Amino acid sequence: MKAKVLNLKGEVTEEIELPEVFAEEFRPDIIKRAVLALQSHRRQPYGPNPLSGVDYSWENWGPGHGYARVPRWKLGRRAVVVPQAVGGRRAHPPKPERKWAEKINKKEMRKALKSAIAATANEELVRQRSHVFEGELPKVVSNELESVKRTKDVAEVFRAIGVYADVERAKERKRYRAGRGKMRGRRYVKKKSVLLVVGKDDGVVKAAKNLPGVDAVVVKDLNVELLAPGCHPGRLTVWTKSAVEYLGEWLC
């Protein structure tokens, strides 16, 4: 399997042989497991204060009073502490000691990563994610892109290679989030657009991340969630030549 290498003006400069990883079998089931496992490691443990609902001065009246034998407030007769009492503790609350992180076999995670990488070269899968682009996949650009330091210049390169329309799609579809998330630092729902994978960061990662929906990462830090946001593989991805060469050494 071969790919054309484009320069910063979108012109074909050479043709390279792609690593075997781009011919990997498509396994959406394993990709989903890997993404959910990665997401689970970001969950924070939560639970009530141990004293919630039980921090009362109470006594038990015992039998013979015609009342239920439950803890009662010392300054009155209303029930406290028990779950069925107003202001009492919860019956089975979430436990802060619960382990939220899901485990996955190393070989499965590796298989998922290889399958997600191969999906970026599948035009049908990429279009199913509503990405907009021109030309052939995968998009491989010369290593000159790694030293671009201005967002404006990155946008010009994306226009030249035919993927900037997807950035505009993400910008137009930004909207207010419904519900309580607006109060929790998640005011907008933003769409994912291009993923830029480079062999070495000489300034382009920070510049590219300023574009709507764009993620940029050094190839050694690549993970399944970046390649398949929301468990849906086939993200529109731009590779530099050095990143593709690194894949051949790393995963093949």
Swiss-Prot record:
Keywords: Ribonucleoprotein, Ribosomal protein, RNA-binding, rRNA-binding. One of its GO terms (molecular function) is structural constituent of ribosome. One of its GO terms (biological process) is translation. One of its GO terms (cellular component) is ribonucleoprotein complex. Belongs to the universal ribosomal protein uL4 family. Part of the 50S ribosomal subunit. One of the primary rRNA binding proteins, this protein initially binds near the 5'-end of the 23S rRNA. It is important during the early stages of 50S assembly. It makes multiple contacts with different domains of the 23S rRNA in the assembled 50S subunit and ribosome. NCBIfam families: rpl4p_arch. PANTHER family: 60S RIBOSOMAL PROTEIN L4. This is Large ribosomal subunit protein uL4. It comes from Archaeoglobus fulgidus (strain ATCC 49558 / DSM 4304 / JCM 9628 / NBRC 100126 / VC-16). The gene is rpl4.
